[in-house]
């Protein structure tokens, strides 16, 4: 799969790109039941009814570092094609894994509020990108991602965790800044990439099927750990960065290099 110069320019201007047909249907049809089984088995809220969950729980079931649970999922997470695309989009010679996660929005699941990802990550540069990989065709009614075009350049709500508050603050900022919201259906095989500072959300899932998605977060091979500024960043440092010292390259066993240009 090859990116054009227009693709790269669009990503850097818009903060996201939705690419069609990145992965074959058969590949996703193979991995979907494996990822679904692991997600269900390790769901921290298993047995809790949707109506009894908080805002975050109603938005999706979340499980991180699936690649450590299953060798087959590791193959997908370590996919050179996706890692190369990530590297080319953010303009680095190589990328590391930050982590992967499954995000399953249950039938009748709630919205995912507006937020930015990188406020959770103790990284010292903006050279990060997330691949969002739906595991089924995803119509708008199922709650695919919605992006604020160009919002990664706006410095909006960068210290606000995902919440009712982030939804309110960012909704107001989008109107004030006249940011265009882009929400599109995804065909099976489509993959989108978004910057760590791109504003995004997802609508509720009004269908009777779960919206199943897998994500892989990539960062520059030379990404350094910055001093944490919040409990969320401290949690991430503990979870993913091991004994990396502040200011050092995040190069522990959980953050392997996934692609390096020849």
For the regions a language model picked out, list residue spans one by one.
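Double-stranded beta-helix
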Residues: 9, 138-201, 223
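A short beta-loop-beta micro-motif enriched in histidine and acidic residues
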Residues: 90, 116-128, 179-180, 186, ...
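Non-heme Fe(II)-dependent double-stranded beta-helix
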Residues: 1-14, 20-114, 120-122, 159-160, ...
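Short, surface-exposed loop/helix-turn segments at secondary-structure junctions
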Residues: 116-117, 164-178, 208-210, 229-235
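Active-site region of the double-stranded beta-helix
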Residues: 92-93, 118, 123, 134-144, ...
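Short, solvent-exposed loop/turn segments at secondary-structure junctions
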Residues: 24-25, 102-104, 109, 119, ...
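Non-heme Fe(II)/2-oxoglutarate
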Residues: 38-41, 45, 159-160, 191-193, ...
């Amino acid at each position: 799969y090859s990116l054009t110069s227009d693709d790269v320019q669009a990503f850097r201007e818009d903060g996201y790109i939705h690419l069609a047909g990145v992965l074959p249907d058969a590949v996703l049809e193979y991995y979907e039941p494996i990822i679904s089984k692991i997600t269900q088995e390790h769901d921290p809220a298993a047995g809790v009814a949707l109506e009894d969950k908080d805002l975050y729980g109603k938005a999706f079931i979340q499980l991180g570092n699936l690649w450590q649970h299953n060798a087959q999922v590791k193959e997908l997470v370590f996919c050179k094609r996706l890692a190369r695309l990530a590297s080319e989009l953010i303009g680095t010679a190589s990328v590391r894994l930050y982590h992967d996660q499954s995000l399953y929005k249950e039938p009748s699941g709630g919205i995912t509020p507006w937020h930015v990802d990188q406020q959770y990550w103790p990284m010292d540069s903006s050279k990060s990108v997330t691949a969002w990989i739906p595991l089924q065709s995803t119509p708008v009614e199922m709650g695919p991602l919605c992006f604020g075009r160009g919002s990664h350049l706006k410095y909006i709500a960068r210290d606000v965790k995902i919440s009712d508050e982030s939804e309110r603050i960012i909704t107001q900022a989008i109107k004030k800044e006249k940011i265009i919201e882009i929400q599109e259906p995804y065909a099976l095989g489509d993959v989108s990439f978004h910057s760590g500072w791109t504003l995004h959300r997802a609508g509720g899932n009004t269908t009777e099927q779960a919206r199943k998605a897998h994500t892989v977060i990539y960062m520059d091979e030379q990404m350094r750990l910055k001093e944490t500024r919040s409990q969320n960043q401290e949690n991430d440092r503990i979870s993913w960065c091991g004994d990396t010292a502040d200011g050092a390259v995040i190069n522990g066993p959980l953050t392997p290099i996934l692609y390096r240009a020849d």
